[in-house]
Every structure is written in structure tokens, then in C-alpha cells.
């Protein structure tokens, strides 16, 4: 296979997205010094629509379409995504070619005045961008007011600093990647806020026909992370996972096994269905599918029927 002399990485324009793309660029440059690796910065529809929640404007695919167009028309050879933003069903001619080692998958509590969610007084406003976080906060802290929070990381922090919210909840990985870990007042353990499928991981998307790019990316992948996110995304895929569904799935490697936890919640937090499964890590897909079936059998189907036009069958 002929050596690739030049690679172009498609990326969103936010500071966090650029950090992620630059991280992949630097890894590729270090491994393939003879290859020129550059960035193509694009603005996605998801970056432009900031006055409505993702659940109301089309969901996660809003962050990838423009990048996929660049792959199709040859302007880019690969696209770097936060994996939790990548739809679980990637259709031909696209493929998720590589998943890098995961950063911290937890959610982070950020506030200028309070140390944790438990410290917030009744009626305090908590900002979050996802129904998943909202439902879990409402379930544990029904006295708090959860308000939507859109925009890039700097915009969200600015809204907190302007007094729009008493606290906000964000992905810890994004704060840490941008050197903002000092803003974190508390990390929310999975018992308090189960993460989204793929949270903290970076995924690289290519065209299925680019065997040359796939071969170059292979050494960058992390097998343990891939197993975990495969199980998580299997749950989401079987349940029609999207921004319209308060769905969480988090897997970790425990010795030779993969341990998976998942939940589906009503947006108001009054109903939460949970499932746990574990098994050999090479059975990640099956573990995720089993957990999804458990959720459906235990009542998630009723929640999904209220949220989705066509809900999955058990």
C-alpha cells in the first residue's frame, strides 16, 4: 500500500474540538513524520443553533454532517469527534475507524459559590445541555430547577460567571483537555450521574474505502476503550438512543471482564429504569444488547413510547 503523503483532518471550530483534532494531528505527525497532517475547520449546524436544546432541533447528527460532507467531497481524509456526539448508526460509506484511549468519563459540577449539587439551596438553577443529566439531577434533587444550557464550553462557563445559573454540569473531559480542571468543584460518580455512551472518548471517522487511512490510524486505537464504548453504544443503538432520550450507559474493564451499567429515565426524573451486565470483554456488543433488553423488559419501553414516535420492541 502506497504511503500517504498528506492527511487533512475535518474538525468543528470550537476550542475543544480544535484541541481534540490537534491532539490527533500531533499523534499522527509523531508516528508518521514524513506525512503532512493539517486541519480543516468547519462550522456545523449544531454549532449555529444555540437557542434550543439538541432534543428539539435534531440531535447529535447536527455535529457531524458537515464533517462527513468534507470526507465525501475529498476535502478531508478523516474527521475527529467527541464520541458521545456521534450517532450510533453510521451508514455507508462512513465508518468509525478508531477510538482513542478514554479520558475521564464522569460529569463535573462547576459553581462559583457551591461545592456540590447537595449544597445548592431549593430553587437554585442548574444548567445542563442534556436530558440525561437533567433527569438524573431531577431524580436526586427535585428541589432544584434544571435549565437548558447551550453553547461551547467557554460560552457555558461565561453564563455561569454572569450569574445565569448557580451551577452547571459538564463533561469533565472537556474541562480537563482545555486546562480548566480548576473550575471543577466536584466530580459526579456514576452512582450520581451515569455518563453518556462514549463520554470522554474520541472517535475518528473515515470513508469505508480508505484502507490506507485505516491502517495509519490503527496504532492510535485503544482496545479497552473500544470494548467499553462498543457495549455502551450497543445499548443506545437498541433503544433508539438520541438526544430525545434520557439514556446513560457506562462500561469499565474489571480484570478480564467488562462491567456495564445503563439506565433510561423519564425527563422529569420520576421514573428511572436501570440495568447491569458483565461478561468477557470480547463480548462487548452482546453485553450491551443484553442490557438494553433488560431495560426494555423492566419498563424502559413505556418511557421510550412516550418520547419516540416508534419505540424499540423488547
Swiss-Prot record:
Chemical reaction(s) catalysed: 4 porphobilinogen + H2O = hydroxymethylbilane + 4 NH4(+)
MF terms (GO), sorted A to Z: hydroxymethylbilane synthase activity
Note on how the cofactor is bound: Binds 1 dipyrromethane group covalently.
GO annotation, biological process: protoporphyrinogen IX biosynthetic process
EC number: 2.5.1.61
CC per GO annotation: cytoplasm
Names of the cofactor(s): dipyrromethane
Positions of modified residues (S-(dipyrrolylmethanemethyl)cysteine): 243
The organism's place on the tree of life at top rank: Bacteria
UniProt keyword annotations, A-Z: Porphyrin biosynthesis, Transferase
InterPro entries per the UniProt record, alphabetical: HemC, Porphobilin_deaminase_cofac_BS, Porphobilin_deaminase_N, Porphobilinogen_deaminase_C, Porphobilinogen_deaminase_C_sf
Pfam families with a match to the protein in the record: Porphobil_deam, Porphobil_deamC
Pathway listed: Porphyrin-containing compound metabolism; protoporphyrin-IX biosynthesis; coproporphyrinogen-III from 5-aminolevulinate: step 2/4
Sequence similarity: Belongs to the HMBS family.
Function text: Tetrapolymerization of the monopyrrole PBG into the hydroxymethylbilane pre-uroporphyrinogen in several discrete steps.
Subunit organization: Monomer.
Further remark: The porphobilinogen subunits are added to the dipyrromethane group.
Name this polypeptide is given: Porphobilinogen deaminase
Lineage, top ranks: Bacteria, Pseudomonadati, Pseudomonadota, Betaproteobacteria, Burkholderiales
Gene giving rise to this polypeptide: hemC
Amino acid at each position: 500500500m502506497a504511503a500517504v503523503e498528506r492527511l487533512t483532518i475535518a474538525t468543528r471550530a470550537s476550542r475543544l474540538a480544535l484541541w481534540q483534532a490537534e491532539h490527533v494531528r500531533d499523534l499522527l505527525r509523531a508516528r508518521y513524520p514524513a506525512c503532512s497532517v493539517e486541519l480543516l475547520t468547519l462550522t456545523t449546524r449544531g454549532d449555529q443553533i444555540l437557542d434550543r436544546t439538541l432534543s428539539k432541533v435534531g440531535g447529535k447528527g447536527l455535529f457531524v454532517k458537515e464533517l462527513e460532507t468534507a470526507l465525501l467531497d475529498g476535502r478531508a481524509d478523516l474527521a475527529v469527534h467527541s464520541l458521545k456526539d456521534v450517532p450510533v448508526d453510521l451508514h455507508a460509506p462512513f465508518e468509525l475507524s478508531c477510538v482513542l484511549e478514554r479520558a475521564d468519563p464522569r460529569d463535573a459540577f462547576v459553581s462559583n459559590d457551591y461545592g456540590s449539587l447537595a449544597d445548592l439551596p431549593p430553587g437554585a438553577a442548574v444548567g445542563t445541555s442534556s436530558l440525561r443529566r437533567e433527569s438524573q439531577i431531577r431524580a436526586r434533587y427535585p428541589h432544584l430547577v434544571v435549565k437548558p444550557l447551550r453553547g461551547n464550553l467557554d460560552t457555558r462557563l461565561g453564563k455561569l460567571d454572569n450569574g445565569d445559573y448557580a451551577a452547571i454540569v459538564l463533561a469533565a473531559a472537556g474541562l480537563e483537555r482545555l486546562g480548566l480542571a480548576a473550575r471543577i468543584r466536584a466530580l459526579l460518580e456514576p452512582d450520581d450521574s451515569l455518563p453518556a455512551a462514549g463520554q470522554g472518548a474520541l472517535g475518528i471517522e473515515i470513508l469505508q474505502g480508505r484502507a490506507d487511512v485505516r491502517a495509519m490510524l490503527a496504532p492510535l486505537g485503544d482496545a479497552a476503550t473500544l470494548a467499553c464504548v462498543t457495549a455502551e453504544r450497543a445499548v443506545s443503538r437498541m433503544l433508539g438512543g438520541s438526544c430525545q432520550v434520557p439514556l446513560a450507559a457506562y462500561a469499565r474493564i474489571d480484570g478480564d471482564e467488562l462491567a456495564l451499567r445503563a439506565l433510561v429515565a423519564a425527563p422529569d426524573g420520576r421514573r428511572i429504569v436501570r440495568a447491569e451486565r458483565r461478561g468477557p470483554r470480547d463480548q462487548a456488543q452482546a453485553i450491551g444488547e443484553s442490557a438494553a433488553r433488560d431495560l426494555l423488559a423492566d419498563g424502559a419501553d413505556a418511557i421510550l413510547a412516550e418520547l419516540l414516535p416508534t419505540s424499540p420492541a423488547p
